[in-house]
Amino acid sequence: MLLFYMVRKENQNMKIKRLLAAVLSLAMGVSMMTACGSSDSSSKAENDSSATENTQKHTNDPMTVTTAKDLVAQMKVGWNLGNTMDATGSGLDAETSWGNVETTKLMIDQVKDAGFNVFRLPVSWGTHMDENYTVDEAWMNRVQEIVDYGIDNGMFVILNTHHEEWYMPKKDRADKDVEQLKALWKQICDRFQGYDEHLIFEGVNEPRLRGEGNEWIGDAESREVVNQYAKAFVETVRASGGNNPNRCIMVTPYAASSTKQNMEALEVPQGDDKIIVSIHAYLPYSFALDTAGTDQYTSIDSSITTLFTDINEVFLSKGIPVIIGEFGSVNKANTEARVQCVKDYLSTAKQYGVPCCWWDNGTRIGNGENFGLLNRSEGGWYFPEIVDAIMETVNS
C-alpha cells in the first residue's frame, strides 16, 4: 500500500518538474524569440524527453510467432485497463477524467504477477486528433508509455480504438469514416512498427449504430460497413512498415456481438494467417451485465455453452482464432456466485482454446457496471477470490 502511495507521490513530483521545465522553456523562448522564432507548444515541451525515450526503445524487435493460432495458444487470460485511456475527454487529463487514478507501471506489474499475461489497453483517439486527423503527440507518447508497461514485463498487449464517436456504420458515412480510420491507424502503425508479436492491434471496438433502436443488433447495411472498416484497417496495417506486415491483428463483427447472425456476417480477410476475431460476451446477461438482473448463479448457464459452440462453428472450425476481448460480471454483493460463474465461463473457453479478457473499469460499488477487480489506488485486489478462481481455472 505504501509503495502505491510512493509511486503516486513520484508521479506528482514528475508533473511539477515537467511544469517547471515548461515554464522555463517558455521564458527562454520569449527572450530568444528574435533569434529562434516561436516556441514549441507546452505539450510538446513536456513530452520531448519521454517521446525520445519511448520511440527509440522498440525500434526493431525480432518477430518469432508465425501465425495467429500460435500466438493465441500462448495466451492464458487477460485484463482490461477500462475507463482510463478510453475516457472521452481531451488532453492528458482525460486519463483520469472518469474517476480512475493515473496508470503506473506498478499497477500493470501487479496484474502480471497475479497471472494475467494479456493486457488489453482501450484507447479513445478522436478527441486527441485535429481536423487533419493528426493525433496529439503528447497523447501518443502517453499511450506508448502504458503499452511499454506491459511489453517490458513480457505481456501480450492489445491496443485498440475504443469510444470513437466519429464513426457510424452507415453507407452515407462510410467513406469519411474509412478515411479517418486509415489516417489514425497509419500513425499508430508508424509509432509502434518496431514492436514484436507481443503487441496486437485491434481495429475498432464494438462498432454499432449508437443511440438507435437496433444499436446492439444492427442490420445488413451496418454489418457491411463494419466489414469495410475491417478491410481498411487490415490494408493499412499490412501496408505500413517495420514488423506490421507480419503483426497479428484483430477484427470484430458488428458491435463485437456474439450473436451467430453478426458473427457469420463478419468477412475475415482471406489468405492472412495473422488475423484474430474479437468477441465481447458478458454471460449470462441477466447475471453478468444487467445491473437490475439476478444476483444468483448456481450451475453452468446454457448461454455460455452456446457462445462457444457458435464460436467454434463460425470461426474455430475454419482455423480462425478468437479472443473474448471483454467478459466479466458486475458486483452485486454476490462474490460466491461470481466465482462459480467465472469458473464455468473460463473452463468452457479453455476447452475451445479461447483466451478471455476481464473488463475492469475500476469501479466496485454503486449503481453502475461495477466490474472492478484491481484496487488501483492502494494496490491489492477488491475480490481476490475471483482472481484466484480465474487463475485456478486457466492453469488447471
Model-based region annotation:
Residues M1-N13:
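Short, Lys/Arg-enriched N-terminal segments with co-localized hydrophobic residues
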Residues S31-A35:
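C-terminal motif of bacterial Sec signal peptides marking the signal peptidase cleavage site
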Residues G37-S39:
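Bacterial signal peptide processing site
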Residues A51-V118:
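N-terminal carbohydrate-binding accessory modules
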Residues D61, G99-F119, M129, Y133-H162, ...:
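An active-site-proximal structural segment forming one wall of the substrate-binding cleft
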Residues L81-T103, D130-V135, R173, S286-I304, ...:
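Acidic/histidine-rich helix-loop elements
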Residues E179-G293, L307-V330, Q351-Y352:
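Active-site region of glycoside hydrolase catalytic domains
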Residues T305-Y382:
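Substrate-binding cleft of secreted/luminal carbohydrate-active enzymes
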